[in-house]
């Protein structure tokens, strides 16, 4: 039985912050479902400020009737076929060394904060794949640890990734899942949706758009941090706290807005919304046009509120939604064939060394 080890400095599943967590959890779950032994090492402290999260982790597991073992600040539990381990930041290196020796993984997946050190530590013992979730220093930093593979989540990221000796760069699009049967049946309102309304994601333009279109309902979903106070004065805005299951929101809105000012790698929300028949309007920044394909509306990053308002009014969300759903379905195929094509799956099927 092949063994995969996911090791990083963020929380292990099922605790989500953004797209990187979702992408890796779905990939790990696919490997586990295919018969791999899948181990997921993370931390119960945030890597950016070491804020403690252990209490929240315990509470969540208790609420979901998930048994766990706790010893010497290590928390172990099973989630969707994965063996999950959450430890303090200062123990990641020592626990990783122990896992490399005892579990003897065939492949180690790592990414984000501190991933270069993890890749360098694991490289002598196993095949190492660094997942490139963005073109930021955090997203591309794993490459300095010289992983055997650098898996870019889009062609855009692949083009921006620096070439590194000993690292093969390839595209591995994020995994997605089809909506549950019956989820598509929900009345769609005239409201439009935006996730993570912060400055980098286009909040300034959003404020202008909300004021320019008082007749249009906007639903905003909390993302990286709570910005509800910034939008509290608008009568045409509904602000929703962060939710794990976005399906009801996708199904009940006619458009998703992606007015990012930064170079997003490959926004998961575009594909997720499309799987529910909700098309998107986005800027031409980063990997947004790649995620939209020819089934959404792409506006220049320099476009103002009036141009966005015109696009909202003119969008044929019925036709665009059907086309978007059809295209997005292709992203729900298994990722194991891609790993096989890259030489990762055969390596995992070979005897461990």
Language model features by range: what are they?
Residues 303, 316-345:
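A charged, aromatic-enriched C-terminal amphipathic alpha-helix characteristic of glycosyltransferases
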Residues 88-90, 110-115, 132:
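Short His-centered aromatic/hydrophobic patch
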Residues 251-265, 278:
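Acidic donor-binding loop of glycosyltransferase active sites
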Residues 137, 146-182:
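Donor nucleotide-sugar binding/catalytic pocket of nucleotide-sugar-dependent glycosyltransferases
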Residues 10-14, 33-83:
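N-terminal strand-loop element at the rim of the active site
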Residues 261, 278, 282-289, 301-303:
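Short glycine-rich donor-binding/catalytic loop of glycosyltransferases
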Residues 178-233, 239:
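Conserved catalytic-core segment of nucleotide-activated headgroup transferases in glycan assembly
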């Amino acid at each position: 039985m092949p063994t995969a080890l996911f090791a990083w400095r963020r929380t292990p599943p099922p605790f989500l912050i953004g797209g990187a967590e979702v992408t890796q959890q779905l990939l790990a779950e696919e490997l586990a479902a295919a018969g791999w032994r899948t181990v997921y090492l993370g931390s119960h402290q945030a890597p950016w400020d070491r804020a403690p999260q252990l209490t929240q982790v315990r509470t969540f597991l208790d609420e979901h009737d998930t048994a766990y073992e706790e010893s010497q600040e290590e928390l172990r539990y099973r989630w969707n076929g994965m063996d999950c381990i959450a430890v303090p930041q200062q123990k990641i290196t020592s626990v990783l060394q122990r896992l490399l020796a005892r579990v003897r993984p065939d492949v180690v997946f790592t990414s984000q904060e501190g991933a270069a050190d993890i890749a360098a530590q694991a490289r002598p013992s196993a095949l190492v794949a660094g997942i490139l979730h963005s073109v930021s220093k955090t997203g591309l930093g794993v490459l300095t640890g010289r992983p055997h593979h650098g898996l870019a989540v889009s062609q855009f990221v692949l083009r921006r990734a620096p070439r590194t000796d000993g690292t093969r760069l390839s595209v591995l699009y994020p995994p997605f899942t089809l909506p549950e049967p019956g989820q598509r049946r929900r009345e769609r309102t005239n409201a439009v949706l935006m996730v993570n309304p912060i400055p980098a994601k286009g909040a300034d333009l959003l404020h202008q758009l909300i004021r320019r279109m008082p007749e249009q309902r906007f639903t905003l979903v909390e993302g990286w941090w709570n910005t509800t106070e910034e939008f509290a004065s608008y009568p045409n805005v509904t602000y929703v706290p962060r939710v794990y299951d976005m399906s009801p929101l996708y199904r009940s809105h006619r458009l998703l807005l992606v007015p990012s000012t930064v170079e997003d790698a490959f926004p998961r929300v575009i594909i997720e919304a499309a799987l529910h028949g909700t098309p998107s309007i986005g800027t031409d920044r980063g990997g947004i046009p790649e995620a939209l394909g020819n089934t959404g509306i792409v506006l220049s990053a320099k476009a103002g509120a009036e141009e966005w308002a015109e696009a909202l009014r003119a969008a044929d969300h019925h036709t665009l939604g059907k086309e978007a759903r059809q295209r997005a379905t292709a992203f729900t195929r298994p990722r194991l064939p891609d790993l096989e094509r890259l030489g990762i799956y055969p390596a995992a099927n070979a005897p461990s060394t």
